[in-house]
Amino acid sequence: MIVTTTSGIQGKEIIEYIDIVNGEAIMGANIVRDLFASVRDVVGGRAGSYESKLKEARDIAMDEMKELAKQKGANAIVGIDVDYEVVRDGMLMVAVSGTAVRI
């Protein structure tokens, strides 16, 4: 499945706009543990433990969105948007959305 942030796919014609699709993932984060992990892992300004959690949550949300698009008969998703929110008690939510299309 082709997934893109752009509104179209170069060299491909969108035959049908099917529906808006989305996916969400909420990951629990122990603030104290993550704070110490960040201090320990910071190399070149990057916190490896936190980045790993972000990637895991993003992958789960993207997979959920792709599966929904596939169930609706789409073979591509255009206009992808990825949002990150910290919700109560230090939990992280990743929400992705886009338009399921058939090319």
From Swiss-Prot:
UniProt cross-references to NCBIfam families, sorted A to Z: PRK12855.1, PRK12856.1
> What InterPro entries does the record tag this protein with?
UPF0145_dom_sf, UPF0145_YbjQ-like
Q: Which organism is it from?
A: Bacillus cereus (strain ATCC 10987 / NRS 248)
What is the name of this protein?
Answer: UPF0145 protein BCE_1095
UniProt family annotation? Belongs to the UPF0145 family.
- UniProt lineage: Bacteria, Bacillati, Bacillota, Bacilli, Bacillales
